[in-house]
Structures are given as structure tokens and as C-alpha cells.
């Protein structure tokens, strides 16, 4: 109730209303309210793909011959980490050399650590914690996965696409996130098994390349 009152006060008193995506604008301001879309800015050159960086980074983590599934997100309920863990568990049953790279911190981290241990897959899951080296970890990954319940405009998903990564994300992300032909959106209602297949199918994208020019034209 307090949130609804606050929304009405903001909409009625603001000179300009700005949202990072159409879907976010409709959620926050309502579909009948006029607002402007201002997409988040990113230094695209910082995420340019480098084969040299990928090789070195994977060697540093002893992941040269591994299939690395990864995400970069805060450990919070909205990011839906349990769904990712359950989906990865099924990936692992089909691909023994699979590894899960989790980059981030947050209030749900201990719960996810316990979940991984309970499933007995801790040898296949790497927790990195907070980092400013996002580019390095995107280069390590073979596929980026984000099963969030909802997102405004996920910057890290844009960054993953710049670096040429295949991306498997939920329909909780807005359509504005679809910037290359290597990203697919799926409903969470498809379940863990189908999501595991979506992740495994991403292996068909065997060639990594920069997508800077493609994304700049968006």
C-alpha cells in the first residue's frame, strides 16, 4: 500500500519520468503514463573479446578443458539462484566436465553454499565473490545464464553479449536485452530439465567474436 501511494506521488509530482526499459516503465509508472526510456550506459570497449585473455584466465582457474556455465549477479531472491543450481545439477549429469562459476555476493550466498554442499556438487561449483574484473570472468565462461524473476535492464547480460557469449536468460528480462543472435529467453515454468537442455544446446556457438559493432547499432 505504501509503495502504491509513493508511486502515485512520484508520477503526479515529477516533471520527467524515466525508465531503463519499456517493461520497467510500465511496472513502475503504469501503461497509461507517459515516460521516457533511457538505457543504461556501458563502456563497450572494456568487454571486447580477447582469445589471449580467455586462454590465460581459464588456465589460471584450471578450467581449460571444462564446460563453464556462469553468472554474475547479487545473491538475492530476485536473481533466483536455487533455479540455477538445480538446472546446473542436471547439466552435470549429462556433461561431467561442466563447472558452474558464480560471481557475486549477497544475503542469500550462505543459503546457496549450503544447497550446493547438500547436493554434493561443491567440486563443480566455484564461488568468486564480489569483483571488479567482470571482463575476465565473462571470458572464462562458455555460456552465461540468468534465471531472474525480474530485471530492469541487466547490464551484465549486455556485457556478456559484447564479449560474444551465448546467453540463456529468463522471460523476466525485458525484450530490449535481445541484442545478438546468441541470446535466448525462456520461461521459468519450463523447469530445470528443459533449462539444462537450453544450456547444453548453447555449445553449438563454438566461435566467440566481438559483438561491439552489432550492439552499437541497437
What is the meaning of each model-derived region?
Residues 130, 149:
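Aromatic "clamp/platform" in nucleotide-sugar-dependent glycosyltransferases that forms part
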Residues 113-129:
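Nucleotide-activated donor-binding/catalytic signature segment of Leloir-type glycosyltransferases, i.e.
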Residues 166-170:
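Short hydrophobic beta-strand element within catalytic cores of glycosyltransferases
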Residues 1-18, 26-29:
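A conserved, positively charged/aromatic
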Residues 48-62, 204-205:
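A short helix/loop element that forms part of the nucleotide-sugar donor recognition site in Leloir-type
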Residues 67, 71-90, 107-113:
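A conserved mid-protein helix/loop that constitutes part of the nucleotide-sugar donor-binding site
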Residues 23, 41:
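Carbohydrate-associated surface elements
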